[in-house]
Amino acid sequence: METLKGSAAAGPIRTAVVGFGISGKVFHAPLIAADANYSLDVIVTADPDRASEAARLYPDARIVPTPEDLFALSGDLDLVVLGTPPLTHFDLAATAIAHGLPVVVDKPFVTTSDQGQELISRAADAGVQLTVFQNRRWDADFLTLRKLVGEAVLGEVRSFESRFEWWRPEGFGNWRDTAAVSEGGGILNDLGAHLIDQAIQLFGPVTESYGETANHSPDPGGADTEAFVSLLHESGVRSRLWMNGMAAQVGPRFHVLGSESGYTKWGLDGQEPALAAGTTPTDPGYGVEPQTDWGTFGIDGDLRPTASEPGAYPLFYAQLAAALRGKGPLPVDPEESLDVLRVIENIRAFA
């Protein structure tokens, strides 16, 4: 793969963020703006209110209404970040690649595995770097569990339970609620892209998958609002994953049982709400969980709190900068996101 040349090889990586909804505003723009490896040069949004807010928050960025305006500036850019609905990912990423621009695609990667394979092939042919924003690999709780698994203190892991549940019956009011499954909508596409990815990162490739989906929204023809997934890994571990945006009571975030011990964690990672509230990644205490939120490790009768590793979303962009300069691997191999998409497709084929 080609690496950055000229001023970007040493100076800031000139970056454009496409979309300024939850993804662009809460995640990408703050993370990029806080990293000295980057300059946030362009933000694309057609929404007047979002454009005004983007201009207020990032006065040095150029705000343009359309991707066409962005790609007209491609000679002045080094990276494109897509924080748009999944139905747009393929065309926008393909256009960025055609302009020779490295691209970050938010999850879900694309709407079909065929599209994903095509993008990977086009990027390889063009010598352009392509990655996917699987930011939940840098959640505090996931980093903690990954450390415990790596240290083998649980013994042989036999069962892994993972939940992303909350009570939000009104929905998000965006593509997550309104897009059809074929357009990347539904909770399995949205959160399954995270939870399945985490399970594979922990326990390896999947040999069997099964799932159930349900729609509890007022629209009987709408996409799923609840999903359950069961995975059998080559390692022998069984993962069971729950996703529910209408859960009046939530279960533990993680419940992991091994031959020697177990680990249980409640509550969701705090980085997203912190970023949404205006905290920046450079603020003291960013990503640090209070002791009251720590998980417990041990066996019944001998349980003890286990300090959470700091949440670290900024590492995605730090690792990406190194990769773009030829100094390390991409933070997320798009082939791994493609594997997740194939699992989701298999589940949907039989759910």
Which ranges hold each PLM region?
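Beta-loop-alpha module in the N-terminal Rossmann-like domain of NAD(P)-dependent dehydrogenases
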Residues: 58-122, 312
